[in-house]
Amino acid sequence: MATATPPPQDFPPYPPFTSLRLAAARDVAQMANLSVQGFKDSEIFRYERPGHDQYPEDAVAYFANLYRDRLEDPRAVVIVAEDWDGAERVVVGVGCWILPQDSPRTGQFVVPCVGDREPALDRDLCCRRLELFNAVTKATEERYLDGKVICDKFVVHPSYQRRGHGTAMLRWSLRLCTQDTVDQGVIPSHVGEPVYLSLGFEVIGEMHVPDEGDTQGFTQRVAVYKARQT
């Protein structure tokens, strides 16, 4: 006896896009490249990837695989911003959010057939620092961001910053949170923090990344957008 195909799940509508769209599998390479360009001067990137100048291609492979994972993740939402590069439209910004475990949108934004993972040599990485950072981040999220939408990745290519792409992506995510009455949390970089605060996020705590050998650690603040109060 043939097995009946289950009916498609009825998801709630999401806010409409104007200049943005949901990410697709064809965007992975552009998302990876712009993420390296946008993140490489951040305190996190420098801490984790001391060998980047020697092996720049390794970070690109890492981000390509990360975005493939996110596109297939039932709890992830990935959107992109586009702009002109000559006569061609290119991806210039990426926003990625992780939904709470009980979200009715789980599975809504899954992208199939994202392609094979690339060999990730990670020669630029300091594995010890990566372990430290991941452990501290996990503990911080469990303490401050449990049950919230978490802003996982948020970046605009340096050549296209100050054109409103970052603000547009973040505003869309806030409309989604407001519609679902779910708060959003983030542990932003020092450079990115003002963008969040300008749109209504409030600082509620700190995350301390420890020194590792001769490498100095750093502190980032934790911020939350309280959608339930809007």
From Swiss-Prot:
<dbReference type="InterPro" id="IPR052523">
    <property type="entry name" value="Trichothecene_AcTrans"/>
</dbReference>
<feature type="domain" description="N-acetyltransferase">
    <location>
        <begin position="143"/>
        <end position="230"/>
    </location>
</feature>
<comment type="pathway">
    <text>Mycotoxin biosynthesis.</text>
</comment>
<keyword id="KW-0808">Transferase</keyword>
<protein>
    <recommendedName>
        <fullName>Acetyltransferase</fullName>
        <ecNumber>2.3.1.-</ecNumber>
    </recommendedName>
</protein>
<dbReference type="GO" id="GO:0016746">
    <property type="term" value="F:acyltransferase activity"/>
</dbReference>
<comment type="function">
    <text>Acetyltransferase; part of the satratoxin SC3 cluster involved in the biosynthesis of satratoxins, trichothecene mycotoxins that are associated with human food poisonings. Satratoxins are suggested to be made by products of multiple gene clusters (SC1, SC2 and SC3) that encode 21 proteins in all, including polyketide synthases, acetyltransferases, and other enzymes expected to modify the trichothecene skeleton. SC1 encodes 10 proteins, SAT1 to SAT10.</text>
</comment>
<dbReference type="InterPro" id="IPR016181">
    <property type="entry name" value="Acyl_CoA_acyltransferase"/>
</dbReference>
<keyword id="KW-0012">Acyltransferase</keyword>
